[in-house]
Design a protein with these regions (language model features):
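Substrate/ligand-engaging "lid" and interaction regions
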Residues: 1-492
Length: 492
């Protein structure tokens, strides 16, 4: 295999597509914070395609990592060795794979190692866009009040001055420097999977800045664009075994290969007053009604992902496409969509949801992706309210059947125990649940309905929901998820 770097691009196997533009002629115009697999296979891929078109040379990417630890340092070192290059292998449902090298990231900075370098890059006049993938729960917004939490330890540290540690500290400090130097601001574009991600980002950064002083906060609120967007692509984690397999298949020795499905969608508001690459020429959709796209995607695709994940994990499954081999899971998704979502959702103008069910099942069933159920189910306390609150509220208002949503939350409560029906333990990743939340959850399964992320749903005291929830909870405890799944399907 050939080690990946700028100097070896011309020697890579012919089947591997490589950048055809001059990477040395690029300037950094985009700083991306949180360089995970999703960014590398979505935004960075679109920008890579745009860089092949004339006039976009000013929009190379500088990646930034803010987490510390051995893995984060190893990632930074690998990007340096590989000159920011990495491979993406896209797998179609029929198994056909295509590998390409992404050259859009021309620099990578590790904040804990050199905070000033990150600030200098953010402050540089060439930087016109800062994009984010910091996870749905990374905006430090209280789920119940919608207020930015100033007392979070790392936030409090950054507000006290000194070298920043949080994304809020870095971005706001850089904007303060730009303002003091008479430079224009930049756009801050969230690419995280939540409704109103731009509005959420505005709330977070302006609130942080307001704690420093009203003048800076007002300037940021006025001068920084925060476009809303909808992003959609499945890009699973790559294990060591999968890394070896990807590299053996491509013939490229890549320390950081990424993989994804062929489906890719990015819908974004065109609010980039300081300039942007011509992304519309490479498949990105610019629309004013992003919220409608987010609603359809969240309530149908992301919500279905969660319906599939928790009962499957409890039954001992760990891989998404293997869980989809159970026709009951396919039927659960189909029934959820046809009865609980499609009759009530309003799709964007010109968009039909008629084929969504088939598309969702096909995407989830892609055997080449090997997506992890624990990844899909992780951080459920953040994701479930985001993707299911509107559906639950709509069903309650319509006096409709709540059995499938009760089944989902009962399975989630059981999942939080960290043990499946076979007696095997699994890790539970729920960073937004507090000690008080966990205390309620350990007292009884229904405690999850009173946990802070779920209180706004009002389900703990909703009689018909509680009857269904308690019934599923009892079945899960006595007979397991397979019987509970049979029961909820028998009710439809």
């Amino acid at each position: 295999m050939i080690a990946l770097s700028d100097s070896t691009l011309h020697r890579l196997p012919a089947a591997v597509a490589v950048p055809r533009y001059d990477r040395h002629a690029l300037k950094v115009g985009v700083v991306h914070i949180g360089v995970g697999n999703f960014h590398r296979t979505q935004e960075a891929l679109y920008i890579d395609e745009a860089l092949h078109l004339p006039g976009n040379e000013s929009f190379g990417i500088c990646g930034v990592g803010l987490t510390d630890g051995a893995a984060a340092r190893a990632k930074a070192a690998a990007y340096k060795v590989q000159d920011g290059l990495y491979t993406v292998t896209e797998f179609a449902p029929d198994g056909i794979a295509r590998t390409r090298v992404i050259g859009a990231m021309i620099d990578y900075l590790h904040g804990p190692a050199d905070p000033e370098a990150v600030l200098a890059r953010l402050t540089h006049p060439d930087t016109r866009i800062v994009t984010l993938t910091i996870t749905e729960g990374g905006y430090n917004i209280d789920e119940t009040t919608g207020v930015f939490t100033l007392t979070a330890p790392e936030v409090a540290h950054d507000l006290a001055g000194g070298e920043p540690r949080t994304v809020f500290g870095y971005v706001v400090k850089a904007l303060a420097r730009r303002r003091a130097a008479g430079l224009a601001a930049f756009a801050v574009a969230s690419c995280d999977n939540l409704r109103g991600n731009g509005d959420t980002a505005r709330n977070a950064f302006v609130s942080f800045a307001r704690a420093r002083g009203p003048d800076l906060a007002n300037w940021i609120d006025r001068e920084v664009d925060f476009p809303n967007s909808m992003v959609d692509r499945i890009a699973p984690q790559v294990s060591d075994a999968e890394r070896a397999k990807l590299n053996a298949s491509s013939g490229v020795d890549d320390r950081l290969p990424a993989m994804a499905e062929t489906f890719n969608q990015w819908v974004v508001e065109d609010r980039f007053r300081y300039g942007r690459p011509a992304l519309e020429a490479v498949g990105v959709t610019f629309r004013d009604d992003v919220a409608a796209f987010v609603a359809v995607k969240g309530r149908m695709i992301n919500a279905s992902h969660m319906h599939m994940a928790y009962p499957s994990i409890l039954r001992g499954e760990r891989i998404v496409h293997e869980a989809m081999r159970d026709p009951r899971i396919v039927r659960l998704i189909s029934t959820f969509l046809s009865r609980d979502v499609i009759p009530y959702v309003e799709p964007p103008t010109g968009v039909s949801v008629a084929n969504y069910e088939t598309m969702i099942v096909e995407r989830f069933s892609n055997p080449a992706i090997g997506d992890q159920l624990l990844r899909v189910g992780g951080d459920g306390a953040s994701k479930l309210p985001i993707f299911h609150s509107k559906t639950i509220a709509t069903l309650i208002a319509a006096g409709a059947d709540l059995s499938r949503e009760a089944f989902l939350l009962a399975c989630f409560a059981r999942y939080l125990l960290g043990r499946d029906d076979n007696g095997s333990d699994f890790p539970v990743f729920e960073p937004v649940l507090t000690a008080a939340d966990w205390e309620q959850i350990r007292d009884e399964p229904a405690g999850v309905l009173r946990a802070a992320p779920f209180t706004s749903l009002g389900l703990a005291d909703h009689a018909s929901f509680r009857r269904a929830f308690d019934r599923v909870t009892e079945t899960l405890a006595q007979y397991g998820a397979s019987k509970a799944l049979d029961d909820v399907l028998a009710e439809t």
